[in-house]
Amino acid sequence: MKHLFIINPAAGIKDRSRQYIEEIERVFADLDEPYEIALTEYPRHATEIARAHAAAGAPLRIYSVGGDGTLGEVLAGCYGYRNVELAAYPSGTGNDFIKVFPGLPFGDLAALVHGKSETIDILRYNDGVCINIVN
């Protein structure tokens, strides 16, 4: 399975994308699995990146590296693609989604990479989808 990290440099108090890239490279140094890192450059860019990769059809785990807004954008891009798993790697200011799952290792990148995915409910509204908040 390929791993795609969509990093939002604008999430959180300061840009920590370099730190996240180094951590990703460290975790994958001894793994024989393909990965790619993409940095968002403008609003809704995470949606575009996720959709483009999901549409390829290959098994894919996408990591949303940002806050709740980034997570929502990534979800919008991969929703409906059965080949995609979505993981939240929090780096925003609120990170409300992960607060509903106390005790789970969302902040441990290696645990996310090696972890098993679970199915959760998604909310659909008008012409969009959301995981925990409607923007």
Q: Which role does the model predict for each range below?
A:
Residues P9, V65-G67, Y89-S91:
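Glycine-rich beta-strand-to-loop/alpha-helix junction loops that act as flexible
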Residues E48, E73-V74, D96-F97:
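Phosphate- and divalent-cation-binding pockets in alpha/beta enzyme and binding domains
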